[in-house]
Amino acid sequence: MLIRNLLCLLERVAAEPMSGEIICYSPHANAGYCSWSYTQLLVEAQRASHALESTHGKALVPGSRVLLHFTSHWDNIVWFWAVLLAGCIPVMSTALPTNGFLRKAHLEHLARTLINPLCLTRAVSVSEFADQDAVNPIVIESLDLAKPLGPSNNPSGSRKHTRGLEDTAAVLLTSGSTGRCKAVCLSHGQVLAAARGKLDALPPADESFLNWISLDHVAALVEVHIQAMLARKTQIHVPAPYLVSQPTKLLDLVHAHRVSRTFAPNFFLARLREALKNCPTTTANENLNGATSIRADQPSRWDLSCLRCINSGGEPNKTRTCQEVSEALAQYGAPGNIIVPGFGMTETCAGAIFNQHCPRYDLDHQLEFASVGRCMPGISIRISAGLNSNQPVPIGQPGFFQVAGPVVFKEYFNNKHATTEAFTSDGWFKTGDLALIDERGHLSLTGRSKETMIVNGVNYDPQSVEDAVNEASIPGLVPSFSCCFSCLPAGSETEEICLVYLPTYQKDDVAARVETTASISRVVMMAVGVLPQVIPLDEAHLQKSSLGKLSRARVKAAYLRGEYNAQRNLNHDLIRAFRRETRTAPENEFERDLLAAVIDSLGPLDEDEFGVDTPILDLGITSIELIKLKKDLEASLRLHRDIPLITLLTHPTVRDLGTALRKLQGTQVYDPVIKLQAEGTKTPLWLVHPGVGEVLVFLNLAKFIKDRPVYAFRARGLGGDDERPFTNISEAVKTYYTALKHEQPNGPYAIAGYSYGSMLAFEISKLLEANNDRVSFIGSFNLPPHIKTRMRQLDFKECLLHLSYFLDLMTEARARELADELRDCSRDGALETVMQNASPTRLAELALSSSGLLRWANVAFALQSMAVDYEPTSSVSGLDCFYCIPLAVVAASKQQWLEDHLAKWNDFTRSPVRFHSVGGAHYTMLSPEHVFDFQKTLRRALENRGI
């Protein structure tokens, strides 16, 4: 028989014996649980519906909305069905804001949107509706719920049969881009199609469903309650606090109730992992690729052989977390693919796309965040070229994620504008996410289209900034309680970046406040290139949803309303006072002049806060600003000789720099090693310069690597006219090898080169291995093993043009045009032509003269000339190749570059090469807009090599 609506489903299941039961745990600690059969649920719902109709029948017009505001699962379940039996539409209320102003505004918005709905609640919650008149709650204790049902007062008769599959069954609330919720209409047909699709995609065993999130979330309502009913299975509902405080209780419940399916977002999985590490019955060990394995010492504690699926969504799932939790649970009998990341929204009736091959698929494809998988029946997906575009992009290309199908909603209640905006002209729902579909049909989310922040013309995803802050493990910040957004201050022409967070320190611990602010600022500066507005807030201002998510839209709206002004001003005043009190003053006139020159060059800086011991690089300055500082200091201090950039890099404070500058008049000895980053205890990372010889290109990258020291090799010849370039590869390799062993006598070693530097890194690694040293990581940044053909193309003029494009003095297209013009020119003529065609603004930014460019080009040409007959020989233990869009002269596409050129590294390694696709092109892969994603890929590759 066709199920016409949800009420038909309830009646049919209630009439079947042994169709399962509903178990609800009390919200009170140690109060146990109660259970009801589906037959008892129907009776309770009929009684509640009759009591409501008896008292408020005139207001219960068919199709009218009834807001359900309850804290217990059982209340929500009973009254959901009671309202349906009354011919009305249940609206599941979310938790009300604790802030009085926001709560009133929210209720007024609901009253307008839902057109004066009835509201049901318990007496214990009625105080939440104080100080407002928009929504007047009905206390269910005032209804006559004890009256027995008879044929004359049974509400399950005619009304349920008038509702068809297209009619609205329920309304759920979801946050919109302005912070105001939208009301999502879920039809009977949509909900039933979604439940069937989930059962088809992930068939349950003969066990039960476990839910621990509130019924206002679509996953609890549809993915557990309705789906379990359709499957004739038992469902268990547990209050979230019962589990969040003690994550292993989830396993206790699975074991006790023989649960086959449950739900856990990434934040809970991370907590479960940590709880298992510290559990008396387990031991945590680090495996070879750096991941933590958790071994069960007493496997009998939990029998998880019943567990088939832990759905996970609502936030990105880290592959490593999925791997570690899966391995831990497998110790107790769970299958290896127990974690099922997925995608779902209120508009799609919760999860509709599932990754059933996690973490194996994601590890094989080297995904930092797990794929969300493939579609269940009832939904189709596409990636479009634009937000409103109907044109799909090719497989593997990111774009705007859209969905369609029977499980997708049709409208927002009483909001035609939002409904129109939500769909494309051909009827596909715009999810607001950015994503791509890989060659196997797996979907991966890459960001949110509406939350993009634009900084200096570059788009950034605020989620990636929050991830960076959380990954930094800052002591003064509660993990996952940070929120990043951008806004345009009044009177400003550019957006500012804001980050609010929940602190761990006491309010009067100013030193911790200052250190936390500085740490957050450094991370954000590294991610987006500008200093953020950092504001600590209390937990009342950072309320999470039932899935543990902070609403960025709501937080941003509160900031724009000025609700955080007091906290911002207090934080600013305390930090400023602390820095003034602890500032180190100059000791002599030279330090005073040098400090003033630095402040003038890098300003605006507060002279009362920036002292001689303040690290200059902590300001997050770019390589361009570093070069500007060099020229400004040379001019203001009237030094007799240029300041080498190496001096600025290796002497990061005014005091250190002053000492170095006093010695500048003496004889300089070439040292190839530049220490870019000194923090961390992991294996140091050594970076070899590209073909231009300089290491400035690594500055952006080094900022992100705080868990290990970062060194770079700088070519000889850049320090002045007295410093001669290398004459052959062997000389360079031996020089770098000797310097490396002096700085790091023992392995394991990690070394990588950018472009030309990859060849030198390969040769240095061979020399290390020949001397019985272990090289755990060798990286090639976009260079194949065979390079002599390209090197022979690069005469002095080509090197000069190559350098000019690398320094952004001109475009690649203009450099190619000049190549023909300069063919018969002398060196001096070529240099003059390049200077004439170079961007004057860029030359000024670099403070680059004709003689300076000539010296640089001579070094670049010397390096290229060394490799015109280079042939790779022998092999290394392994290699990681990071590849991007190639130069136009070497390959027509990224895929051709990989298959025809880079893949040949496999001929020179004793294990398969690991290839990593990264963003950008050959000259931009480490630029500010790409370096954040690049460093994540690099750090993951280092971890996977066991270092």
Swiss-Prot record:
EC annotation?
Answer: 2.3.1.-
Q: Which GO terms describe its molecular function?
A: phosphopantetheine binding; transferase activity; very long-chain fatty acid-CoA ligase activity
Q: Extract one GO BP annotation from the record.
A: fatty acid biosynthetic process
**Which reaction is catalysed here?**
2 3-(4-hydroxyphenyl)pyruvate + 2 ATP = atromentin + 2 AMP + 2 diphosphate + H(+)
| Keywords assigned by UniProt, alphabetized | Phosphopantetheine, Phosphoprotein, Transferase
Q: What are the boundaries of the region Thioesterase (TE) domain?
A: 684-934
- From the UniProt entry, list the residue stretches annotated as the region Adenylation (A) domain: 25-413
Its pathway is: Secondary metabolite biosynthesis
- Modified positions (O-(pantetheine 4'-phosphoryl)serine) are S623
Residue ranges of domain Carrier in the record = 585-665
Notes concerning its domains: UcdA has an A-T-TE domain architecture. The adenylation (A) domain recognizes and activates the aryl acid substrates, and loads them onto the thiolation (T) domain. The thioesterase (TE) domain shares the missing condensation (C) domain function, and is responsible for condensation and final product release.
The role this protein plays is:
Nonribosomal peptide synthetase that mediates the biosynthesis of usterphenyllins and uscandidusins, p-terphenyl derivatives. Within the pathway, ucdA condenses two 4-hydroxyphenylpyruvate (HPPA) units to produce atromentin. UcdA first activates HPPA through its A domain to AMP-HPPA. The HPPA unit is then loaded to the T domain and eventually transferred to the TE domain. Another HPPA unit is then loaded onto the T domain. The TE domain then catalyzes the condensation of the two HPPA units and the release of atromentin via cyclization.
Q: Which family does it belong to?
A: Belongs to the NRP synthetase family.
The name on file for this protein is Nonribosomal peptide synthetase ucdA
> What's the source species for this entry?
Aspergillus ustus
